[in-house]
Amino acid sequence: MYRTLLKSKVHRIKITGADLHYEGSLTLDEEIMEAANLIPFEKIEVYNVNNGQRFSTYVIPGVRYSGECILNGAAARLGHYGDIIIIASYAAVNEKDLESFKVNLVYIDENTNTIKEKKEVLALNSKVLAKTNE
């Protein structure tokens, strides 16, 4: 059986721009993408802390070290410059791989939109795994 688990999270990044007439997607600083283990065109979920909007799109690389986070296409209507968002990506993980599965958590400095801290954590501890396998 497969379980859907959080794979990557970019926590509290500020929107730095919007381009309504771009094809679509979210443009994200390439350094932040790499830290979060996100690849170009990967599906992401976006949660806008300021207005409560939640939507799906895909991520494309922006200029490295720029701190950019740009909503493109229809998504540009769902957030404004300066809004704080959370970006999440999920993965289907086989139960036999749960013990080695790692989540990438990237925390953003709210003043500069650069990486404040990155953590790789085990998604599940042994007690949870024991309950899952019973």
From Swiss-Prot:
Post-translational modification, as annotated: Is synthesized initially as an inactive proenzyme, which is activated by self-cleavage at a specific serine bond to produce a beta-subunit with a hydroxyl group at its C-terminus and an alpha-subunit with a pyruvoyl group at its N-terminus.
Binding-site list for substrate: T57, G73, A74, A75
Gene Ontology biological process terms from the UniProt entry: alanine biosynthetic process; pantothenate biosynthetic process
MF terms (GO), sorted A to Z: aspartate 1-decarboxylase activity
Predominant place of localization: cytoplasm
SUPFAM superfamilies: ADC-like (SSF50692)
Catalytic activity from the UniProt record: L-aspartate + H(+) = beta-alanine + CO2
Involved pathway(s): Cofactor biosynthesis; (R)-pantothenate biosynthesis; beta-alanine from L-aspartate: step 1/1
Key word Cytoplasm present: yes
Catalytic residue positions: S25, Y58
Cellular compartments annotated: Cytoplasm
Oligomer status and interactors: Heterooctamer of four alpha and four beta subunits.
Main function: Catalyzes the pyruvoyl-dependent decarboxylation of aspartate to produce beta-alanine.
Name used for this protein in its record: Aspartate 1-decarboxylase
Protein source organism: Sulfurihydrogenibium sp. (strain YO3AOP1)
